[in-house]
Amino acid sequence: MTLEILDIMKLLPHRYPFLLVDRIEDLEPGKRAVGIKNVTINEPFFQGHYPGHPIMPGVLIIEAMAQVGGAVAAITAGDKDDQVPYFTGINKARFRRPVGPGDVLQLQLELLSSRRGLFVFSGKAYVDGNLVAEAELKAVFAPRSQD
């Protein structure tokens, strides 16, 4: 299953400038997915991180992985229109290489477990086949804000 940006926006509450996934490919509900993030010089964080040497903050790579995991959790859980996935934990985060403008992040998420509404994922981010970051991520569903 493939999700284009409008499909992703139906599943996740994130919007510009914090929607960090452009496409999700190879989504297998209850199992795995691969997200794509095209990193451009137009990203707002490059204005200050770092001038003259733009590097995507590692925490935003983790957030991009979490967003892919949130989409997998939403599709897996089904019928959660009144709820959204919330990132609740991170373990074993490692950053291997910097990511910059022009890079295409491939975000591979594998669902390790889903019990009592808690989803646990293994996430790995790659650029050109090279591992740039990895982490274990946790998410739960909570009621959507009624603002």
UniProtKB/Swiss-Prot annotation:
What molecular function terms (GO) are annotated for this protein?
(3R)-hydroxyacyl-[acyl-carrier-protein] dehydratase activity
Q: Where does this polypeptide localize? A: Cytoplasm
Instruction: Tell me which UniProt keywords the record has, alphabetically.
Output: Cytoplasm, Lipid A biosynthesis, Lipid biosynthesis, Lipid metabolism, Lyase
InterPro entries for this protein: FabA_FabZ (IPR013114), FabZ (IPR010084), HotDog_dom_sf (IPR029069)
Biological process terms from the Gene Ontology for this record are: fatty acid biosynthetic process; lipid A biosynthetic process
- Enzyme Commission (EC) number: 4.2.1.59
- Where is it chiefly localized? cytoplasm
Q: Where is the active site?
A: H49
Q: Which GO terms describe its cellular component?
A: cytoplasm; membrane
List the catalysed reactions. a (3R)-hydroxyacyl-[ACP] = a (2E)-enoyl-[ACP] + H2O
Give the main EC class.
lyase
Cited HAMAP family: FabZ
Family (UniProt): Belongs to the thioester dehydratase family. FabZ subfamily.
So what does this one do? Involved in unsaturated fatty acids biosynthesis. Catalyzes the dehydration of short chain beta-hydroxyacyl-ACPs and long chain saturated and unsaturated beta-hydroxyacyl-ACPs.
State what protein this is by name. Answer: 3-hydroxyacyl-[acyl-carrier-protein] dehydratase FabZ
Organism name: Syntrophotalea carbinolica (strain DSM 2380 / NBRC 103641 / GraBd1)
Q: Which gene encodes it?
A: fabZ
